Amino acid sequence: PWYVFDKDIDKNELFVCQGINNELLLSKRLECENVSWINNIDHSFPKNCSVQVRHQHTPIDCKISIKDKIFNVEFSEPIRGVASGQSAVFYDKNICLGGGIISKSA
């Protein structure tokens, strides 16, 4: 089967690859916008925490930095299934810190 691994909305293009284990389906980082923080926790950056990008995924360790109002999230290891438009939710152990909308993955 074929899987979508990227899209260019401006050009109306989808990029596909073959096979569920294709390395193109893995992401090492993402960019997040419209981030909202909850709880009265220190939100200074860079910040080490964990992120969950899909309902069934286990949160994975990450490092968050910020540049020009874009939150850059680097994973401790590549993960599958990151797509723009999805939510990214950040945790410190079992405490939810907040979340945002994924604008780009790589």
Where does each model-flagged region fall?
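Hydrophobic, well-structured mid-protein blocks that either form specific transmembrane helices
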Residues: 1
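Basic, glycine-rich polyanion-binding accessory segments appended to enzymes
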Residues: 7-97, 102-106
